Structures are given as structure tokens and as C-alpha cells.
Amino acid sequence: MIQSVRIKNFKNFKNTKIDGFTKLNIITGQNNAGKSNLLEALYYLVGKSMHPCTNVLEIYDNIRKEPLTSESKSLMFYGLDTKEEIQIVTTLDNNQTLDLQIKFIASENQKVIESQIIPTAEQTQMSSQLNFTLKKNNEEIYNDHLNIAKVPNFPPIPNQSGYNRQFKNFDSNQLQKLLPFESAVIIPSDVVYRQAHMIQAVSKICSNNQLEEELNKHLNQFDNNIQAISFNTNNQLKLKVKDIKEKVPLSVFGDGLKKYLHIVSAFMADNAKTIYIDEVENGLHFSRMRLLLKNTIDFINNNKDGNLQVFMTTHSQEFIEILDQVIREKDFAHQTKLFCLKQDDQYVIPRTYYGENLEYYFENEENLFG
């Protein structure tokens, strides 16, 4: 499991270290304090594919919906200053480290392009580069460039003219060296952005009768009128609902059910050992927040390897109060921490609150949100 992270020159993090992560980590803080940015920094290192270039592109293209170009690339750098390289270092609880450094390299052609008002078509496609260096325990595993065009095709289509975002994949030896680091799943605040990922996860679950039955039970807990989930011939998710003859498309249900399904299916279908959930409370009634937290703790406790780790961001005082109740009921307080991020001048300052003391913090009217 991830024990700590140090983030330098990434978005609003000039130089911040956060220590003491546990199995269930709740991230709070004021608006623009860096809650989502923290999840993204961790995901850059350990994303679904375990490849930093792929992880960065996924955040830009599928989460932020801001295609990575020679212009938008500066958004990942602190103060938009691409002269300083990004560094993200995570340490596991066994003291193994994973270190990612990202450096922008502007081509001479790109410098000319950016000085002109109207570039030619040929100049528009000339690419700059992001250099990625990935180390494990100070041993270099990967060092290569991701080419980025000024105006890429979007959505990006490989092997098409103008698609300049090539990079070198890991070979089997590099992948072996990355063990025991495991892949991760990120769930954004707006689940519509990741609809394809949810469909893929549910498809995997429905190919296994036992898992499909378990998923149906989870959906029935959320809404006891829901009896089953399935795909139609057009690969559209539909739900069998009590007293309705025709199956009902998932699209007509509210965001709360979609968010719940997305999270539960990620726990069930993915082999990820780390799950990042942004603005977990979005769309959820307080009773369903309780249900989600109970299920999350059950997934962590029932993980066969005992190393499943969850990070959630929230703005909701109500969610934290429900969390306090659930972790005491489930005897999980000692494996829960709350990290409050506060922007203090140039730096993000983390404050740590312990799950077993949440009730005490409430009684003393402690500000848990910065």
C-alpha cells in the first residue's frame, strides 16, 4: 500500500509531502486546495496501465476533457511554469519507492511556431515533447518521450495523419521490475466521463454468474425495486425493475445510481489495488452514502491479498459524520484517516485527522475542511 507521497511542481503543489496513508483515506479541503490534483498525481504514477504516458493521457483526454497539446501541457506544471520539472514520489509501507519525473522539452520548431500569429499547416503539426523518467528504488525503469502536437486529433486516433503522441511501451522486463506496485482505477466526480470504463467493468462481471449475482444484490440494496442488470444487443446497460415488463435503460436513472454502480463495479471487476474516487458524495442521498461506505469497508476487508487501498475526496460535512458512524460500527476507525489540504501562500499544507478521533473533533468543532 502507498504510505506517503511527495509532489513537486505539479499543478497547485509546489512542494508537499503527505505521510501516513492507510486503507481508507478521505481527502478534504477548501475549493481549489488540490483534492482532485492529489488523486491525479497518484494516478500518474500508478494508473490502470502502470505506464505514466498512458496515465497522463487518460487524465487529460478522459477525465479533464482537455486534450494534451503543446499549449495545454503547461496546466500540469505549478504556476504554469514548464521550466521546472514535475516530480512525484510514492513510498510503500515496505519502504519501496516509485519516482516519476516529467520535464517539458520544447523543439526549436515549436519555439518558432509559438512566436507566430498564424502557423502554417506543417508547423502546426510539429511536436514538442514531455520527457518521462520513472525510477523504482532509485533504479531507472523507464526513460522516454511523449510527443505532443500543437493541435492533435481529438478524440485522439492512432495511426492517423497528425497523431503525434507516440511513446514507447514497457517491455516485459520493465513490467517485472515494477512489482509489487499494482495498477489503480480513478473514478471522477462526473461519472458520465467514464461511462465506457463502467460498461467494460459490468461486462466483465456479467460474464461470471457468481459476480453477476453479487452485483445484482448490491443494486437491490441501493433500490429494492431493481432486480437485475444486463446488456441488450446494442451493448446498452438495462435494469430489470419490479412491476415493469420492459427492461429500463440505465440512462434514465439518476446520477446517484450511476455513481454507485461505477464504484461497486470497479471494486468487483478490476484487479486494481488502489481506487481513487473524486467527490464521492455527488448524487448520493445520505442513506446511500452509508451504504456505499459499508460496502467499501467490506470490499477492503474481503480483499484476498489484504492490501486494497481507497482514496476519496469530499466537500460534505454530512458524509464525514456518516463516515464516523460507519467506521465505528464496522470497527474500522483505526484503518481510516482524514487528510485536510489547505492552501497556505505558495504551499499546500496537509493536516491529518485520525478515524478513531472523529467524534472528538466534532465535539470540539474542529474545522475538517480547511
From Swiss-Prot:
**Catalytically driven reaction(s):** ATP + H2O = ADP + phosphate + H(+); GTP + H2O = GDP + phosphate + H(+)
On whether Disulfide bond is a keyword of this UniProt record, the answer is: no
Entry's pH dependence statement: Optimum pH is 6.0.
Q: Does the record carry Flavoprotein as a key word?
A: no
The source's domain of life comes to: Bacteria
Q: Which UniProt keywords apply?
A: ATP-binding, GTP-binding, Hydrolase, Nucleotide-binding
- Pfam families associated with the record: AAA_21
Q: Tell me which EC number(s) this protein carries.
A: 3.6.1.-
A GO molecular function annotation here is: ATP hydrolysis activity
Temperature notes read: Optimum temperature is 45 degrees Celsius.
What this protein is reported to do is described as:
Has nucleotide phosphatase activity toward ATP and GTP, but not toward CTP, TTP and ADP.
Designated name of the protein? ATP/GTP phosphatase
Organism name: Helicobacter pylori (strain ATCC 700392 / 26695)
